[in-house]
Amino acid sequence: MKTLLLTLVVVTIVCLALGYTLTCLICPEKYCNKVHTCLNGEKICFKKYDQRKLLGKRYIRGCADTCPVRKPREIVECCSTDKCNH
């Protein structure tokens, strides 16, 4: 009986892990509520914005397999839970 229970627990965990897909916010505005389902292998949500004083902040949000590299005058934030890139 214990073996059957353990087998069911392992199968459940494997099935849940295989079926999980990350969701991230994806829009160019400061306040965002558009949700995007990431592709298989994309395990990171990110938000990038630059600090140009005259033009204001320009936001880029999305999914990635790794955290994007920061460019000069750019801030990059990465996280790995659903809709964490607000």
Swiss-Prot record:
Q: Which family does it belong to?
A: Belongs to the three-finger toxin family. Ancestral subfamily. Orphan group II sub-subfamily.
Distribution of this protein across tissues and organs: Expressed by the venom gland.
The cross-references to InterPro entries, in alphabetical order and at most eight, read: Snake_3FTx, Snake_toxin-like_sf, Snake_toxin_con_site, Toxin_cobra-type
What is the source species?
Naja atra (Chinese cobra)
Q: What does this protein do?
A: Binds with low affinity and weakly inhibits muscle nicotinic acetylcholine receptor (nAChR).
Q: Which domain of life is it from?
A: Eukaryota
Which CDD domains does the entry mention?
TFP_snake_toxin
Q: Quick check: keyword Disulfide bond in the entry? A: yes
Q: List the disulfide bonds.
A: 24-45, 27-32, 38-63, 67-78, 79-84
Q: Name one Pfam family in it.
A: Toxin_cobra-type
**Cellular localization per UniProt:** Secreted
- Which keywords fit this entry according to its UniProt record? Acetylcholine receptor inhibiting toxin, Disulfide bond, Ion channel impairing toxin, Neurotoxin, Postsynaptic neurotoxin, Secreted, Signal, Toxin
Record-given protein name: Long neurotoxin homolog
The GO terms this record gives for MF are:
acetylcholine receptor inhibitor activity; ion channel regulator activity; toxin activity
Q: Which residues form the signal peptide?
A: 1-21
Keyword Secreted belongs to the record: yes
Lineage of this protein's species? Eukaryota, Metazoa, Chordata, Craniata, Vertebrata
How is this protein annotated for GO cellular component? extracellular region
